Amino acid sequence: MTIDRRALGFGGSERAVYAADPWTTRGRLYPEDDSPTRSDFQRDRDRIVHTTAFRRLKHKTQVFIAQDGDHYRTRLTHTIEVAQIARALARALKLDEDLAEGVALVHDFGHTPFGHTGEDALHEVLLPYGGFDHNAQSLRIVTKLERRYAEFDGINLTWESLEGLVKHNGPLLTPDGVGTRGPVPQPILDYCELHDLELATYASLEAQVAAIADDIAYNTHDIDDGLRSGYLTFEMLEEIPFLAGLMAEVRARYPHLEPSRFTHEIMRRQITRMVEDVIGVAQQRLSLLRPQSAADIRAADRMIATFSDAMAETDRQIKAMLFKRIYRNPDIMRIRAGAAQIVTDLFGAYMASPKEMQSHYWVDHIAGLADAPKARHVGDYLAGMTDTYAISAHRRLFDHTPDLR
């Protein structure tokens, strides 16, 4: 039976002219036959969900270590929240929802165990060998490290998905070829030699909504988790005018709410207002730009999906509060120091004796390598660990493992 792919409603019921088009993608590094029932962007999304890297997000954390409790966000729950917000934004702006969701689902693949603490520690030990960047690591995972298919390494995503993964926060190069945020990580440059991701342009609008959805999600859930842990109080939230306004609104409508419901009512309003703000800014910028294709979005001189100046200031205030009250809290700092020690110790142990990695693939793969390529493979192995696995690996190799509670 022949299936009419164009009649299946891929990517949303209606797409604007500036949306990424699943029928005219720039293809994959390794050509494949079309699916009769899914668009290329749907296939990307599905491949992302079925990876080992996606499953590992369940046991990777951002601020609160996995042992802290069952109700704190993990990388997986955060990723699902980001994907939901990204899809809502994409629908409102008539974009390809599948591409936006796929970029949101893959954006955290390269994160190490123990959140940014683990990344900082891994970057420090890898500095003599080029350092570590979680965005570049995400690219390595989906183009090299996932080994599922008979004909290629990685999961062979479309150009649009890879572009969104690499450039969702904006161009990596100026038109003159200078890094916009410092030197471009070598793994990204290496891949672009095979499949040019046009690092000097903006990404699709689908990738941009995935990026701003990430900001919305983590600001909101870090407040929620901070209140749950006791590191934040409602009084602290009232120091920020935007949050104080939301709290007053909830109190006026529900004067006797219990704390947990009060928190939820604040958080849902925060997400709604931020989403509405992004949609308003995007619509305004689109009306000025008048793009006729996704290429016009890439050629623009600024991001289209972003906060207004007022909401950007609120975003800065929230981040400053989270940094002061949570990320720099003495208890969190003690835990972070222990987590960094675990990563540093494991790197040293595996570099000195790769057999301690207890994986035939990894041991065989780095046998006889010089220090630089060996370090990169050890970094790949460490970056793929979950919090719980890293802790258990450290306990096996060392007499004392830091207490991360």
From Swiss-Prot:
This is Deoxyguanosinetriphosphate triphosphohydrolase-like protein. Pfam families: HD, HD_assoc. SMART domains: HDc (SM00471). Belongs to the dGTPase family. Type 2 subfamily. The keyword Hydrolase applies. Residues 75-219 form the HD domain. The keyword Zinc does not apply. It comes from the Bacteria. InterPro entries: dGTPase, Diverse_Catalytic_Enzymes, dNTPase_2, HD/PDEase_dom, HD_domain, PHydrolase_assoc_dom. GO terms for molecular function: triphosphoric monoester hydrolase activity. Keywords: Hydrolase.
